[in-house]
UniProtKB/Swiss-Prot annotation:
Pfam families: DCD (PF22769)
GO MF entries: dCTP deaminase activity; nucleotide binding
Protein name (record): dCTP deaminase
Cited Gene3D superfamilies: 2.70.40.10
Subunit-structure text: Homotrimer.
InterPro entries on file: dCTP_deaminase (IPR011962), dUTPase-like_sf (IPR036157), dUTPase_trimeric (IPR033704)
Provenance organism: Gluconobacter oxydans (strain 621H)
Amino acid sequence: MPIMPDTWIRQMAREKGMIEPFVEAQKREGVISYGLSSYGYDARVAEEFKIFTDVDSAIVDPKNFASNSFVTRTGDITIPPNSFALAHTVEYFRIPRDTLVVCLGKSTYARCGIIVNVTPLEPEWEGQVTIEISNTTPLPARIYANEGICQFLFFQGASPCEVSYADRAGKYMRQSGVTTPRL
């Protein structure tokens, strides 16, 4: 499964709408970088965040998710110490049938104890990506909206898969905004 280069990512974004909006060159001046890189795409975090809180003493249960588990905030945010937030990408992704996408955090945030987690983007999945952001430090941590948050790496299979995410009618297909757990 080879990793795909900038030329392929650019072509797929232009011709197939794989990433919209697509930033052709990496933006770096005065911001946490985002846009096309050599072998990946650095996505931006949008302005909507759901920060987990214990105000209502809710239990986080993936089978019965309670909306009072978090508070919604917009713009640049601060994640409390040892806490967690959900966010989503500015970009909308359309993954080709022969491609699997893996996400890694940005070193700028990782070096501050901020960890980003995203499950793989499966073949023929599409939508805005919900991002999990953990503040592993004992201090409040700042997250900047509309700046880079993670890097997506595109791996192309030797042949298209037999059953894609779209074929399975996956529950997170075409998600928009922050999407909480579904069964």
